[in-house]
Each structure stands twice: as structure tokens, then as C-alpha cells.
Amino acid sequence: MALLQIAEPGQSSAPHEHRIAIGIDLGTTHSLVATVLSGQSKVLQDEKGRVLFPSIVHYAEQSIEYGDDAKPFITTDPKNSIISVKRFMGRSKADIKFQHPYVLVGNDNEMPAFETAQGRKTPVEISAAILNQLKIRAEESLKNPINGAVITVPAYFDEAQRQATRDAAQLAGLNVLRLLNEPTAAAIAYGLDQENQLSSDRNYVIYDLGGGTFDVSILRFSQGVFEVLATGGHTALGGDDLDRLIVKWAKKQLHIESLDDHEYAAFLVAARTAKEQLSEQQSVYFKALDHKLELNRDTFESIIQIALDKTISVCKRVLRDAKLSLDEIEKVVLVGGSTRSYAVQNVVRQVFNQEPLCTINPDEVVAIGASITANQLIGNSQDGSLLLDVTPLSLGLETMGGLVERLISRNTAIPVARRQEFTTYQDGQSAMLIHVVQGERDLVEHCRSLGRFVLHGIPPMTAGQARIEVTFQVDADGLLTVSAQETTSGVKAQIDIKPSYGLSATDTERLLLEGFQHAEEDKNLRHLQETKVEAQRELEALEQALKNDAGLLDIQQLQALHTAKDQLQQQLQSNDIDQIERAVAQLKIHSDEFAALRMNQHIDHALKGTKLEDWSDSQK
């Protein structure tokens, strides 16, 4: 898709000016930066020829070390050596349940800060420090300032995690052209859009097992457009977790009950080394401090089986979501350093019945794809395919009765906007609370609250007459804006969804699974709640009518109406929908009679004092 260029007035670029854009893979364990030079994507090196930048920051009292310079301090000063900060991004202190050596401060429901030798540092600040180092590497390598950057994030990052990433980039002084899902970046890097242009639709699986996150996406390429059909994963499953499983095995083999922070850090380093060596060798040694254990591929596979099983279940679920069979998958692409593992590759072969594609360095493929996208977005390339990412969970708002009205369904391609009209519940209602939720259930109490705002200034009207247009808009970065406008007066309010913390991996999995498991139950509950809300509305309208016109009824009529009303109110305390519907029908018999009397009275009042010839003349 060629992008139209719109320059600032008086600031138009020269027609052949090349602007510098970079792609950044902000990884859990390693980060990379790449750019496009002379039409070719290139991963940028440091002065020692290294492309991988360890995502580590060490805070000493008088200095700060980054990347490889910070690595030695993981074992000697673990509390001040922040690794895998990506796992903390956009998450609350209460969400962080995995083992770590850090002192975290802050309230449980807020994003924490790390207590370091240089004071408190938030995950956003630490990520910004890593991004700044990558920016410096790019500027030194390219001898030019950077005009823009595309930064990749896991496909399963929610709004809070994406916003935290944007905040970190802004703090690092980067102009963010776009946040790009990592699997989508891999598809671009492999040029899957360039294959067999005349063939029919093609489906690809991107299996991305990085240092701290796992994502599986199914992409369809059709008529020049990439669309993510389905995506799934874990925000806390990756190479770090495989390392922890090896440490757990080693502790058991060595009969060690617990490790202090220094020992645990040393065991993690030994686990990572052994894991990487097993990609090339059948058997290696786990060496930590004065301990030494033999570890072969079979044992390693059994150790990490629990993690592999999780990836298998996600793969199967994503295939179901996409409504595809294995025969309909063209290729499987491996992404992330953890996919070098023989055990991981073997699982992929078994699940998809084909040899996975891994001709591009799995550590570099995401950065390469990000650089290609950055080159397109900055205006250097007129070629490219439109990439449509998807929303990982459904988005909606709360309606009367605690029900969820979905405006954007899970796996909807983004960017996307959806509008829907709502109305008031009570006469004279002048404000409306908009409660935005995320999840797959039909009741608000089972979904995740994203935010609330109030639309004030609704003109007083009879219930049901006001028209409130609510718009949900998700941009290309997956960030949500919700607005509400009353159509007659034009009053408007909106909220940008930037939750104070994100979903834990467990919560994300729970929201999806509960949506599947309780689908029938939720359908029945929705029907029950909708019936109750409608019945309550009828009762309130009837109550108001009786205040105004009860004199139209004789004693028997009034008594029968009150009896039917009381019976319905009593049934509303139960969850028996059949009894409620019968009570509604019984009340309707008497309320319809009352409504007819009221209508006749209003007609009489309207015609009172009007002559027959006046009425006849008005009809001519």
C-alpha cells in the first residue's frame, strides 16, 4: 500500500530526500535495532560487532551500565541489575507473581517501581534507557539523526502495556511511527506478501517464542493485504521460563531447598547457557557455582514439557479461532531465540505436520520486519502490503442490568471504529455513565473494567427519546479511544483508555477460557437480565402513570392492576424467567386497559373546545 505524503506547510521535503527510520525489537532478554540501506534491511552492530543488545540496566551508586556492560552485575549485584523489564511493563505490583530479586515499591494496584542504588526507577524509565541506547547505536552507525521508529510489541500486549511502551519511547526521544505486533513484523521480514502473487489466499502461522512472551498468529495474505485472522499467547511465557524450569530441576537434583539472590542469579545464567548449547549438542553440563550436572536433550524436553504443552494448547485454540485446518496452513515461521531449541522445533513439527521456516536468524527477524515497515511509513518506499492486526479481546460497554454490549469483537482487524446508538433509561435523565469493559462474557462482573467517564448535559427528555452515539476507536497501535455524543445538543465526552496496569497472563487466559466455557450459561443469563430490565422499565412507567391518572380506574380495576404489579415485583426477586414472563404478560392485560383509558382522556382533552366544522376544515 503506497502511503500518501502530507508535509507541514512550508516544510515540504525534497522529492528524493532519504529520511532515516529504524525498526526496534524491544525484547525481554535482548533488543535489536535495524534500518533499510540501499533497499536492504540491516541489523545494526555496536563497535564490537555485536547485534544483540542485552535488555539489562545496572544502577550503581555513581554510574549506570547498559547491555553487555551490565551483564556481569547480574550475579554480583542482582538487586540493582534489572533484567526482563518487559515483563513488568503496564502491570500492577499485585500482578507480578513470578520470582525476581528486586525490591518493588508502590501500591498493589499500580505499576511498581524498582528500588535501586540510584533511587526508584519505573519499568517505563528502564525501558526508555534501553531504547535510548539503541537510538544512540543507530545514530552512531548511520551518522545521522533518527527521524522515526517502529517498535515491536507482543501481539497479546493489552492497552496498558502498549501505552507503557509508547511512553518509554517518548521518554527516549523517539518519534514513534507505529507499534507493530512482533508476528506481523516477522511476516514482513520473510516477504510472505511477495510469494506467488497470482495464487489464491495463503495462510501462515507465526510461532514466536521469545525471552519472556509467547505469541501465535495466523496471517492471511489476500489481494495485497495481510490480515491477522487470529492470535493468542501468553504475556509471561518464554525463554526466561524455560530457564526457571531448568533451575527448578537442578535444585531438585542437587537437593537444594532454596537459593539466595546471588545463587539464584548464578543458576539462571547456567540454565540459559546449557539451554543454548543444547541447540547444537546432544548433551551438555549445567555448571553453577561449584555444582555440575549432565543435561541431555531428552531430559531437557521433559523438564520444559509443561511450558511446551501451554504453547500447544494455544496453537490449537488459534487454529480453531481462525476456523482453519492444518492442511490450509501454507507455512509456519519460527521467531524468537527460544525457537532455536531442538525441543521447541520438534513440538512445532508435531503440531503443524510440516518443517518450520527458520532461514532468517530468529533473533533478528522481528527487527528486520520493523525496519521495513519504518522505511515505508517514513516515506522512503512506495511499496508494501497493508497489515491488519487484530484486537485480542472483545471491547464493549455496560448497559442496564449489568450486561455487556460488545462494540468490537475479539479478533477484529485494526485500526477499526464502531458506532452504536444508546438511549436514556429514566425520564429527565441528564447524564450517562459510560463504563468500558474488555472480555468475552455477557455480564460486566465477569469482564475486566478498562475505564469510566460521564456524559453530562443531556437535554431532559422522556426515557428512550435521547440518542447517544457511542464510538469505539482502536488505532493501529491497539490503543482505544471511546467517545459519546448526544445527537440533538452536540454535547460530547471521551476517554483514552490507558489503564494503570495490564492483564496478567493468567487473567488473559482466564478471560478467554471462561468465555468459551460459559457461552450457553451467559446466553441464558443475558436473556434473564434483559427480561428483568424490560420488566422493571414497565413497572416504573406504570408507577408514574398511576401517580398521574389513577382516578381513571374503578376500585376493582385499580386493585387488579396493583395485584399484577406486586406479583411481577415478587417474581423479579427470583431467577425463574418463565414465571417472570408470565407475570409480565398478566400485568400487560391490565396495563393495556389502563393505557387505553389514558389515551382516550388525552384525545378528549385535545379535542375539547374544538368545533366539528373546525375539525372538518383541518382535514381539507
UniProtKB/Swiss-Prot annotation:
UniProt keyword annotations, A-Z: ATP-binding, Chaperone, Nucleotide-binding
Entry keyword ATP-binding: yes
Disulfide bonds: none
One Gene Ontology molecular-function label: ATP-dependent protein folding chaperone
Pfam families xrefs: HSP70 (PF00012)
GO BP of this protein: iron-sulfur cluster assembly
Annotated InterPro entries: ATPase_NBD (IPR043129), Heat_shock_70_CS (IPR018181), HscA_NBD (IPR042039), HSP70_C_sf (IPR029048), HSP70_peptide-bd_sf (IPR029047), Hsp_70_fam (IPR013126), ISC_FeS_clus_asmbl_HscA (IPR010236)
NCBIfam families linked to this entry: HscA, PRK05183.1
Function: Chaperone involved in the maturation of iron-sulfur cluster-containing proteins. Has a low intrinsic ATPase activity which is markedly stimulated by HscB.
Family annotation (PANTHER family): HEAT SHOCK PROTEIN 70KDA (PTHR19375)
Family statement drawn from the similarity comment of this UniProt entry: Belongs to the heat shock protein 70 family.
Stored HAMAP family: HscA
Protein name (Swiss-Prot/TrEMBL): Chaperone protein HscA homolog
Name of the gene: hscA
